[in-house]
Structure formats: C-alpha cells, structure tokens
C-alpha cells in the first residue's frame, strides 16, 4: 500500500506529513499548510504576464480534499496565502465561497507572509504574524534565533535523490526533530533545494531528514544521502 502519509515527532508533538504537503497534528486536531500563493495567476496578469487562471481553484480544491479527509478543528495557513497584497481583496466570489465552505465549523488562522503582510480581507478566520500552540510556534519565515519548536514556510524546500538511474527533485518537508520547514502547498509554486545556503544554520544536519512528496508516496531521506 502506498505510504501517503508519514508520522514524525516535532519537539515531542506527534505530526503527520501528508502527501499533499499538509501537516496534521492529531493531538491538537490542527491541519497546517503553507505558501498557498492564491491568485498568483491574477497577480501576474495585472503585470501583463499571462498565466493559466486556474491556480486558485486547483489549490483550494486540494485544500478542501485534505480538510475533508482529516476533519481538523483548526486550519493554519503559514503565510504567503495570497501572491500579493491585493489578492484577497480582488479574489472572485467563487473562490471566496470555497474558502468559506472550508472554514465552516472550524477555526482558520492566516499567518501573514512577505507577499501578503497586511493579512486577508473579508475572509473567515484571523490574521496574525505568528501563533503558539502546545510548545510549537507557527510563523512564515524561519528564525535563526528561535528555532526550537518552530513550524515555518517561506523557503519552499525541495530535495533531489537518485531513483532508477535518474535524478529526481521533489518538494519536501524538512525537519531535524526540533524545527520543521513546510513544502509549499500552492499548485504553481516552485522549490528551493535543501542544500541552498538559505537553509544554512536552520537545522542540525546530522539529524535532518527530507520527507519528499513523490507521485504516490512519501520518501524519507537523510540529508547526507541527498544529491547536491
């Protein structure tokens, strides 16, 4: 049977890394996603660069599916929820209604990101810079100074492995057991290799594991076994 989720522990808190890129915390009944970058296509169109305009719908459909599966009490979105400051203001009513449906009966927490520092407009839930739960701190950008128990996004980690004589690069959860950096959840977002200098100092590399999101399962690979 395909391993569509992997159980880990973060500072003693049980967590489930889901193949969609979502993180579920069963003891907190909380689902975490990061870097949705909703309305990215619309943001590019406003600058004269045309992308297919279906990214928001596809991302929200994926989010709805994983929320339906886990039925969490709380959903936390770790920043860069929208691709620019006006995304939530100009978003079509169809997508606004999809978010309202996802939020129905649960708490929705929007963490402010660098793309959307002003928070969200006329959407259910609260907008905050960070939130702490059960010894874990949820914020958008990883902090070198305050790493223990941190769950962050921003960097869109990916990793490269060799499989069947080919190099394969996939988004990943990155964790050493003390800190976790989430993969981006948005369907049109890129990734930054875990060996990039932006990750320097964030993890104890001897304990660092990349949980790669494959096509139909998760692959857990120690940092030393990744391709550079």
Regions found by a protein language model. Name each.
Residues 1-228:
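Extended recognition/assembly regions associated with phosphoester-bond processing machinery
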